[in-house]
Amino acid sequence: MSMAQGESCGADTVVADTTVVKKKTWIDKFLDYFNDANKNKKHKKFDFSIIGGPHYNSDIKFGLGLVAAGLYRTCPTDTLLPPSNVSLFSDVSTVGFYLLGIRGTNIFPQDKSRLKYTIYFFSFPSGFWGIGYDSCDNDDNGSEMKRWQARIKASYAVRLSKNLYLGPIVAYDYIHSSRVTRPELLNGQDASIWNLGLGVQLMYDSRDVLTNPHRGYYLNVEQSFRPKFLGNKYTFATTEIETSVYARPWRGAVLAYDFRTMLNFGNPSWAMMALFGSSNSMRGYYEGRYRDKHKFETQLELRQHVWKRNGVVVWGGFGTVFSKFEQLQFRRLLPNWGFGYRWEFKKNVNVRLDYGFGKPGQRGFIFNINEAF
């Protein structure tokens, strides 16, 4: 028995002596982090990851962005419930721009209601060309201002029937501008303003995935009011409509179409005008170079999966700004096109790198998370 014990100990000793646990380097841990980021983690209550990268565009020049994405289910046992999402985003650039914000959609159990929210603030030495297509299209009107802006917007929509939702919205905006080089372009309006708005939202949403749709239809109509009794100096009403449709023409491809419009009725301030260009629509334009009471934008995008977690996109579109509907003319249409790269950061959450082009001199590189629409 003692020999058996001795042999057992000897065997154990040999195993212990020959087993070497290789310690992972920080590079191994870094690669493992991104290799595992897009795996479906239904066992985790909250799946959260962070990534950063450089970018360049015509308004904030060279910058470094940091984004984080989180996925979760309000009812973990309901696998048919679409995951809720939250994104944190921050940015700094060489011209003194900085941004910090959070946005997301919380889908309540059984998808009976949805809470959508956006909170951000930024500081930016921005350009300003005035109000209206003709003024904004004139390069000689280029001026500068130091702008600090904050926004809080939230909507709570209750499901009325399959894919149909209705509910209230609230929005607060504060804009402080200083060092305005050409104040006459403000048309006598205050350089710093705030607005509080209340309204209602009607939404139809049959998209299969909110962050990276492959098929389905989306229609969102928002009607908001900023009356005087809420303390607003500039009183107006805003109608916003966005509609998108998604189809799969062949394997690995998604064809996505988007149309959106913003119509302001009343007396909106220069800071609350409809702005042309953003990271989601008319990509590549200096955001706010063109501004007026109304705008419309439309775009068609082809998204193609290439290999593993990699994909590419191309898009084209056009739009314009206007103060009266009779100003809608072909010569005032602003073209837009571009291409981009996609990397699946998390399951159905893409990091997107886009390079967009507009009129001559209007172009930009965008680093962001989730699809543009």
Predicted regions and their residues:
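Sec-dependent signal peptide cleavage junction
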Residues: 2-41
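Outer-membrane beta-barrel "beta-signal"
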Residues: 199-200, 339-345, 362-373
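Short loop/turn motifs that connect adjacent beta-strands in outer-membrane beta-barrel proteins
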Residues: 37-46, 74-83, 109-114, 159-163, ...
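Membrane-embedded beta-strand positions of outer-membrane beta-barrel proteins
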Residues: 50-52, 68, 86-90, 115-119, ...
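Membrane-spanning beta-strands of outer-membrane beta-barrel proteins
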Residues: 61, 97, 147-149, 195, ...
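Gram-negative/organellar outer-membrane beta-barrel architecture
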Residues: 40-50, 55-190, 194, 350-351, ...
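C-terminal outer-membrane beta-barrel translocator/porin domains of Gram-negative envelope proteins
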Residues: 198-203, 207-305
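Outer membrane beta-barrel transmembrane domains
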Residues: 265-352
